[in-house]
Amino acid sequence: MVLLGLLQSGGSVLGQAMEQVTGGNLLSTLLIACAFTLSLVYLFRLAVGHMVQLPAGAKSPPYIYSPIPFLGHAIAFGKSPIEFLENAYEKYGPVFSFTMVGKTFTYLLGSDAAALLFNSKNEDLNAEEVYGRLTTPVFGKGVAYDVPNAVFLEQKKILKSGLNIAHFKQYVSIIEKEAKEYFKSWGESGERNVFEALSELIILTASHCLHGKEIRSQLNEKVAQLYADLDGGFSHAAWLLPGWLPLPSFRRRDRAHREIKNIFYKAIQKRRLSKEPAEDILQTLLDSTYKDGRPLTDDEIAGMLIGLLLAGQHTSSTTSAWMGFFLARDKPLQDKCYLEQKTVCGEDLPPLTYEQLKDLNLLDRCIKETLRLRPPIMTMMRMAKTPQTVAGYTIPPGHQVCVSPTVNQRLKDSWVERLDFNPDRYLQDNPASGEKFAYVPFGAGRHRCIGENFAYVQIKTIWSTMLRLYEFDLINGYFPSVNYTTMIHTPENPVIRYKRRSK
């Protein structure tokens, strides 16, 4: 996931970083270059150090050789990652390894092979070593991948306890009101960047539902920019370059982290003093304790609130945007979704309820099919800490072990008419239905996304509102290609045409 755009752009990250930091100053440029070179040497030594001897009789996964030192297959993979993986699957089977930027990646494709990753224990296939470098500067210390896995699992359990049906029933009306207010500015017709619009709306609705009214009330343009700067910390430069480099994007990220934390601290203190009952995640965190009875600190609460929002913001907005284009391309399907609104909710389309939302089965399948063809995250990774055996091969410690939802969800062996957008496929028997890990847009096992149910409530409510208000069309038949240069696979130039429905 985190390597993808980096690999496509090659050395451009370094060049841009130098230019931003040095302004062309020769000495500064040399210092940055030295730091970068030392980082590469470190990564190379790390990779060599991981080349451990396999147990006697063990067989390594098929290795895809590259004549290019260090970079390996970075350029080919970055240019067309899905094609690269699918071709490798056809040639080498479900398990294979290759090198990129000094690291060895072993992919597990197909449900049977992917089971190794999703069923693994953290001490065998470790997530912190892969994701901690990115998430800690954004979320803060003491939460998520900055803490021992046992503590992280407790934090996830606490958050999940707040993502319950009782709260969802309240969230539907909150999200619907936010959406109606947001779309007032769209007017009768026009053309919009639907990804940008939905990104803004997802932030507004998620903040209101999850953070509470105190924090939502402060979400103005300045705070929205702080979120954007903080979100900018999830970058290829953040993965590749040392965190202490004075890059503008790093400085903006760190400043935004401090300012947002301060906003949250004030809201937390105000809530602690309040006598009014509240039903949101903030209150859940304030009322919760760890197993040993210790309450969460204000800093932990603030970090978990940031993590909960940003972990789902891009994925939900990307999925929502892609679904808009699938519906705009298939107008009969879009009409059926609109008719479903009237059939389930009533001809006069009254305000939505959670119970009605559950009965919007076609819309539900449209989201599910969008997540199949356009899962926001192409690769889920773990660091092998112990030798792992799968399909007759042994993966040594030090390998980055990967599963690709994108590839698994379009394998010829598992999916009939695999590249077609067909929401009704889930009404029929298909090979994938008998495979546990053929469909994994939210992951599986111990690291399955805890926000899956909230994401469905959020996306279904927003798109129910959009379908009630507007018809959507492609502009001159344009359907976006996938932007593989970003960490989340967004649509390229996602501008869509809309027209208000006649009453």
Curated annotation (Swiss-Prot):
Q: What are the protein's GO molecular function terms?
A: heme binding; iron ion binding; oxidoreductase activity; sterol 14-demethylase activity
UniProt main location, coarse: endoplasmic reticulum
The annotated consequence of V130A reads: Decreases lanosterol 14-alpha demethylase activity
As for subcellular location, the record says: Endoplasmic reticulum membrane; Microsome membrane
Question: Could you give a single Gene Ontology term from the biological process aspect?
Answer: positive regulation of oocyte development
EC no. given is: 1.14.14.154
Q: How is its activity regulated?
A: Inhibited by azalanstat. Inhibited by azole antifungal agents ketoconazole, itraconazole and fluconazole.
Pfam families listed in its UniProt record: p450
Keywords attached to this Swiss-Prot or TrEMBL record, sorted alphabetically, are: Cholesterol biosynthesis, Cholesterol metabolism, Endoplasmic reticulum, Heme, Iron, Lipid biosynthesis, Lipid metabolism, Membrane, Metal-binding, Microsome, Monooxygenase, Oxidoreductase, Steroid biosynthesis, Steroid metabolism, Sterol biosynthesis, Sterol metabolism, Transmembrane, Transmembrane helix, Ubl conjugation
Q: What result is annotated for mutating T136 to A/V?
A: Decreases lanosterol 14-alpha demethylase activity
Q: Name one GO cellular component term.
A: acrosomal vesicle
In the UniProt annotation, what is the result of changing F139A?
Impairs lanosterol 14-alpha demethylase activity
UniProt pathway: Steroid biosynthesis; zymosterol biosynthesis; zymosterol from lanosterol: step 1/6
Biological function: Sterol 14alpha-demethylase that plays a critical role in the cholesterol biosynthesis pathway, being cholesterol the major sterol component in mammalian membranes as well as a precursor for bile acid and steroid hormone synthesis.
Q: What is this protein called?
A: Lanosterol 14-alpha demethylase
The opening ranks of the lineage are:
Eukaryota, Metazoa, Chordata, Craniata, Vertebrata
